[in-house]
């Protein structure tokens, strides 16, 4: 069995660094407490790993929570087949570097029927290749708790979600049927077939995430930093045009400019922003004056009014 206690300083999440400021330290302590609570309370936890910045922070916190042992639960990546190529390369490198138990799941029905965001639209594609696929993977693994990287500052439906978010046997979420959470006491009692989504980053903000990444020197997918990239403008978004599967529509032309991504997902459904931020400090400075949510760059959040809450009620991340 591989040694679970890496002897390189960079592999050790507890390596000596400058002390965290009190705000970030309090957030870190809360997140580590949630990880340990879930691991102690539930029989088969799993961590949902989407490869983005929040997942990278979540993984770092999980490694801290259980160091020097291995992360004691698998990571689940629900792959749609349309992720940025840089994301998949980063995922594989990370799993190997930290000796992670990584599960990849692709909806076999969606793959067989060639469900794509171009042929079926963002709503149907997301329902089949993400929500349905996630339910399949959780059922197959018989997982009773799933860690996620959602934060309350991201979007309205997430703002009212508890740290322990209870799901029915078919993974549905009813926001009216959630339990009170007093201080740091969480009630994890569930009936057979029910499950919990646990969110250790609930009380973090986007700027907190980036400041923590800077303080802890956490690696990220390079797409978060600005560089000259090719893109097309479509439906009010700048879509990366570096994948051969992206076909230009009538009137579209490939452009090139300094762009980056505030959020990562499926490349046809994720819009970039114009930016000159090539370093962590520049990204943080840019965010401190931002006036719109990072999820403005997600096509799936624009499907209809209340679309994210509808997706979450049906079992979405």
UniProtKB/Swiss-Prot annotation:
Entry keywords, A to Z: ATP-binding, Nucleotide-binding, Nucleotidyltransferase, Transferase
**Top EC class, one word:** transferase
Q: Which Pfam families match?
A: PAPS_reduct
EC numbers on record: 2.7.7.4
Q: Name one GO molecular function term.
A: sulfate adenylyltransferase (ATP) activity
Q: Name one GO biological process term.
A: sulfate assimilation
Query: What InterPro entries does the record point to?
Result: PAPS_reduct_dom (IPR002500), Rossmann-like_a/b/a_fold (IPR014729), SO4_adenylTrfase_ssu (IPR011784), Sulfate_adenylyltrnsfr_sub2 (IPR050128)
The metabolic or biological pathway listed in the UniProt record of this protein is: Sulfur metabolism; hydrogen sulfide biosynthesis; sulfite from sulfate: step 1/3
- Where are the residues of the annotated region Disordered? 1-21, 298-317
Lineage, top-rank taxon, reads Bacteria
Q: Which reaction does it catalyse?
A: sulfate + ATP + H(+) = adenosine 5'-phosphosulfate + diphosphate
Homology family: Belongs to the PAPS reductase family. CysD subfamily.
Q: How does it assemble?
A: Heterodimer composed of CysD, the smaller subunit, and CysN.
Function summary: With CysN forms the ATP sulfurylase (ATPS) that catalyzes the adenylation of sulfate producing adenosine 5'-phosphosulfate (APS) and diphosphate, the first enzymatic step in sulfur assimilation pathway. APS synthesis involves the formation of a high-energy phosphoric-sulfuric acid anhydride bond driven by GTP hydrolysis by CysN coupled to ATP hydrolysis by CysD.
Q: What is this protein called?
A: Sulfate adenylyltransferase subunit 2
């Amino acid at each position: 069995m591989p040694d679970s206690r890496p002897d390189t300083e960079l592999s050790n999440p507890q390596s000596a660094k400058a002390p965290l400021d009190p705000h970030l330290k309090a957030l870190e302590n809360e997140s580590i407490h949630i990880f340990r609570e879930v691991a102690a309370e539930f029989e088969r936890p799993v961590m949902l790993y989407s490869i983005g910045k929040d997942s990278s922070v979540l993984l770092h916190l999980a490694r801290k929570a259980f160091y020097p042992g291995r992360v004691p639960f698998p990571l689940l990546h629900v792959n749609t087949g349309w992720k940025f190529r840089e994301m998949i390369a980063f995922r594989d490198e990370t799993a190997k570097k930290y000796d992670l138990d990584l599960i990849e799941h692709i909806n076999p029905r969606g793959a067989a029927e060639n469900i794509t965001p171009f042929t079926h639209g963002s709503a149907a594609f997301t329902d089949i290749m993400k929500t349905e696929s996630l339910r399949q993977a959780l059922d197959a693994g018989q997982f009773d708790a799933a860690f996620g990287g959602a934060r309350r500052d991201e979007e309205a439906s997430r703002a009212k979600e508890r740290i322990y978010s209870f799901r029915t046997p078919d993974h549905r979420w009813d926001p009216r049927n959630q339990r009170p959470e007093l201080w740091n006491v969480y009630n994890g009692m569930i009936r057979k077939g029910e499950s919990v989504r646990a969110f250790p980053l609930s009380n973090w903000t986007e700027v907190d995430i980036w400041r923590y990444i800077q303080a802890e020197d956490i690696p990220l997918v390079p797409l978060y930093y600005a560089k000259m990239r090719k893109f097309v403008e479509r439906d009010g978004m700048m879509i990366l045009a570096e994948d051969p599967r992206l076909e230009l529509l009538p009137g579209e032309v490939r452009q090139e400019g300094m762009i980056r991504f505030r959020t990562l997902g499926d490349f046809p459904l994720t819009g970039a922003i114009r930016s000159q931020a090539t370093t962590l400090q520049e990204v943080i400075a840019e965010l401190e004056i931002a006036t719109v949510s990072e999820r403005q760059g997600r096509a799936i959040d624009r499907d209809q009014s209340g679309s994210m809450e509808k997706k979450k009620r049906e079992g979405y991340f």
